[in-house]
Design a protein with these regions (language model features):
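C-terminal domain-boundary segment and adjacent tail
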Residues: 122-168
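Metal-dependent polysaccharide deacetylase catalytic core of the NodB/CE4 family, i.e.
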Residues: 1-117
Length: 168
């Protein structure tokens, strides 16, 4: 509820991440169309139940496995599938400095993969405390996926955010 109240965009990543591969890892493309749809709908419902508001229709498939028929199967239930181009690998727990270093490698328009569940996330939290002030000092602003997708390309977003910062 706090995250929703703060304006974070909350979308599903599937309902049962660990079970999405049916023994084949986290690959929804190996599931039946019915199971793929069920995973998305149950995830969206869990978010709605927890936050009191509708989940975003943006979806990120576990492991980034999103290809083939899954696009067609989920089309009525999602507006877009989002991937990432900077993986902090925080799920490996390599230490806060290593996570922060990966986070600091971003460029305007990048989508960063980080995790907030699955056990001890103290390294991720510490890395954010290190990296976010530096990124803000460099002029970065943080936007939701919907805000990012509203732009034709990341360059346009970077230019607009830079002009907004100059005006402040």
């Amino acid at each position: 509820q706090r995250m929703a109240a703060e304006g974070h965009q909350i979308g599903t990543h599937s309902y049962d991440h660990a079970a999405t591969g049916g023994g084949n890892g986290v690959d929804m493309t190996r599931q039946s169309p019915e199971k793929q749809i069920e995973e998305v709908q149950m995830g969206q419902q869990a978010i709605a139940d927890a936050t009191g508001s509708e989940a975003s229709k943006v979806f990120r498939s576990p492991g980034g496995n999103f290809h083939g028929e899954i696009i067609w199967n989920l089309q009525p239930y999602i507006t877009s599938e989002i991937g990432w181009n900077v993986d902090t690998e925080d799920w490996r727990r390599p230490g806060a400095d290593a996570i922060a270093e990966r986070l600091l490698s971003v460029k305007p328009g990048d989508v960063v993969l980080m995790h907030d569940g699955g056990g001890d996330r103290s390294q991720t939290i510490e890395a954010l405390k290190i990296a976010l002030p530096q990124l803000r000092a460099e002029g970065y602003k943080f936007v939701t996926i919907d805000q990012l997708l509203a732009y034709d390309d990341a360059k346009a977003l970077a230019q607009e955010l830079a002009s907004q910062q100059a005006a402040e």
